[in-house]
Amino acid sequence: LEVLIEVHTEEEFGEVLKANYHLVGINNRNLDNLQVDITNTERLLKRYNKGKTLIISESGISGPKDIQYLKSVGADAFLVGTSIMQTPDIRAKISEMYYAL
């Protein structure tokens, strides 16, 4: 059983990496203003060497291009919710996202 530690900022990410957690979620939603910016994942990963830590990019992922971009900057997995729940064809949306990998 693993624990997923969620971070939002560079400071939080640095502290979590020092503590050697193996599973880290980078939330792309700014909790102060609720704005979503998927480049938050890239910013944090550029600042620190993730080593063997598995990175899950969370929030703001709406399609295959987002997944391809996040994968290219170092994310290992993705948490997708809203875009799947808002689509009329959930099966097609999940398939589209899956094949982006």
Task: Report the location of each language-model feature.
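Catalytic cores of alpha/beta
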Residues: 9-20, 52, 57-80, 92-97
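C-terminal helical cap(s) of enzyme catalytic domains, especially alpha/beta-barrels
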Residues: 43-47, 71, 86-101
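Glycine-rich phosphate-binding active-site loops on the catalytic face of alpha/beta enzymes
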Residues: 25-34, 73-94
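Small/polar loops that bind or transfer phosphate-bearing groups
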Residues: 4-5, 58-59, 82, 86
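Conserved anion-binding
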Residues: 1-43, 50
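Short capping/connector residues at structural and topological boundaries
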Residues: 36-39, 66, 89-90
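A short, acidic, amphipathic alpha-helical segment used as a generic capping/interface helix at domain edges
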Residues: 41, 45, 63-64
